[in-house]
Amino acid sequence: MSDKPDISEVTSFDKTKLKKTETQEKNPLPSKETIEQEKAAATS
């Protein structure tokens, strides 16, 4: 085991093999309007 990582694989990596994916937020943050509505509903 050497201390230095083996970068030969990294340098020969083919980016064209990667697939483009659409990222989707799992827990999107609520908008300011939604927060205001929830605050108003909680106080009434």
UniProtKB/Swiss-Prot annotation:
Gene3D superfamilies (UniProt xref): Single helix bin
GO cellular component, one term: cytoskeleton
An annotated Gene Ontology molecular function: actin monomer binding
Residue segments, region Disordered: 1-44
Coiled coil: none
N-acetylserine modified-residue sites: S2
Subcellular location: Cytoplasm, Cytoskeleton
Basic and acidic residues composition bias: residue spans: 1-25, 33-44
GO biological process: actin filament organization; regulation of cell migration
Keyword set, alphabetical order: Acetylation, Actin-binding, Cytoplasm, Cytoskeleton
SMART domains, per the entry: THY
General function of this protein: Plays an important role in the organization of the cytoskeleton. Binds to and sequesters actin monomers (G actin) and therefore inhibits actin polymerization.
Family that this chain belongs to: Belongs to the thymosin beta family.
Protein name, per record: Thymosin beta-12
Source organism per UniProt: Lateolabrax japonicus (Japanese sea perch)
